[in-house]
Structures are given as structure tokens and as C-alpha cells.
Amino acid sequence: IRDCLLSRGLGDVYKRQDLDKTMTEEANKIVADLDGLADRRSIVLYNEDWHKGVIGIVASRLTEIYYRPAVVLTRTDDMATGSARSVSGFDVYKAIEYCRDLLENFGGHTYAAGLSMKVENVPAFIERFEEFVSQNILPEQTCAVIDINAEIDFRDITPKFFSDLKKFNPFGPDNAKPIFCTHNVYDY
């Protein structure tokens, strides 16, 4: 029984990973085809076929790739439901709160939120959300910041180094992956 449950659990993980990959690829294609993306300070995407359980992950990926607040919406029954993610220093909750008259429900915090609205309110939400973000985001908040933990010599990057680094797993919010930099490296 235990092996069967474990196998089923792994199947769910793989299914979620496939959904994540497929939806992220679809979202990136939509973003690439958007007119005027360079002039927008936010990304809001709606696709009624996307899986509700993965939209938060996709919103996070869009924020990482394009470094803008992102909202990803899908259809749940007769409502558009979604997840929002933000960039460092920008309060996405306030941006969503600014649109509250268009929403049925919302909640969250500075960097992540959930929301629901009538499907017919999605176009107005996209414009209102963009309005707030454009008026309130600072230029430096739209550029990715890479915090380097340490400089290391290239010759110190060895299999033993990676083996030692693995001992610090698991990485996550309270134990971030370290970021190192080295100099004078060329890609031929």
C-alpha cells in the first residue's frame, strides 16, 4: 500500500511539473506576442483552460523572467480566479486592492495574492492593474537584482565544491541557494 501511495504521489508531482512546463511555455508565447509589452509595467494573462493548481507557479516564473508584477488567471466555474506575484519592493496586494470594485474576493500580502472576479471584468482589471503599477512602481524595481554571496576563484569550482554545497540542501525561503561570482571566464 505504501509503495502504491508513493507511486501515486510521484505521478501527481510529475503531472504538476508537466502542467507547469506547458503552461509556462504557453504564457511565454502569449507574452512574446503582446503588442507594447516594452511599455507595460505589469503582465496579466487569462486562459480559461489553465489548471488552477499551477497558476501561482506560472505567475512566479513570469515575474522571474520579465521582472514585473504578474497575475495569471484561469476560469473556475463562472469566475476568473488567479494568483499574483511581485518583484522586490513593490506591493502587489495594494495594486490588487486598487482594483477591488472589479473583484469578488482577494487576499494576500506584499509579494503574493489570490483573487477572483467575474470573467467579464478581466479586461478592465488588466487595464486598472497596469494603471496602478505604472503609477507606483519605481524604475529600479523593474530590474532584477542579483545578490552575490561570495566571490570565488574559478579554480575552486570543483566536484568537491559541489559536493560540499549539496550538504546545505534543502534550499528554500529560509535557506536560499548561495550565489557566487568569479572573474575572467570566457565562453568560446
Task: Locate each region found by the language model.
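Hydrophobic helix-and-loop "lid/oligomerization" segment in the mid-to-C-terminal part
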Residues: R2-N121
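Mid-to-C-terminal polyanion-binding domains and interfaces
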Residues: D18-L45, Y98-Y188
